[in-house]
Amino acid sequence: MSVVDDFLRHIEGERRFSPLTVRNYRHDILAFVEWLGITPDEFDADTIERGHIEDWMQHLIEDSGLKASSVNRSIASLRSFWRWMLAHGRTKRDIISTIKPQRTSRRLPTFVPDTRMESVVADVVDDIASDEFERVRDGVVVVLFYTLGLRLSELHGANDEDISADFKHIRVTGKGNKVRVVPIIGAVGEIIKKYFSLKYSQNICIAQKKALILSSKGERLSQRTLQRIVDRRLKESGVQGKSSPHVLRHTFATHLLNMGADLREIQELLGHSSLKATQVYTHNSIEQLKEVYSVAHPHERDR
């Protein structure tokens, strides 16, 4: 029996928590374990770092779209689980007590500036020119997040069959299993073709034929691994601050808006059910206009 099962049995049998409370604890803890890409039997608290928990919180907010109150409940469940492990000798490392709850105020989305993103894309193009499967795949991951505005969960769940035969569209299954079709620009279509060619010529796809993004062993990559790929590639290209799939999604939306795209078109591409969720990107554009004004406007320069 796993340590997760032991804890759930403890709160249900010894602490006599209500069935609803036990169900919430089970949901929150198993969601974290699944996000790590492991099973409850494989869970080992001594291999978990504070950064894992912080990245999971970011995933809950940005990819799952949970409110701060829901994220705080999930962290509270994980914190109780961790305290129990400490008290019962299942771990000696307390990495969660200093994790702060989420503020309820909404932050502006973080995005990569145009000039820096050009550097990222140039580095990715170099990677894709290679015949090394993992190098090409990692470049494809970055390109798809940036040029399609996908959520982490959407790319993770994507299959080969979601790419149209002419490589001009991708079928995306978003929140609530809502399906949208996102266009693929020509250059990106050619990059995907190169990736498919390597995947099939090197027999990478034998174990898992349908998953779009695979490991070198032919297995669907976990969400955590996709995050690591993006974080590493952006940092290697000089991106400072946050570097995650959702930062690339924000960058996709912000750059489109700055180039004059209609807000409702961006809403459709992102898969937002409400225009209100998309309007947050207008604040990024306003901030950029202020910066341009302060640098370029003659009246401002004379101050």
Which residue stretches match the model-derived regions?
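Conserved catalytic core of the tyrosine transesterase superfamily
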Residues: 1-303
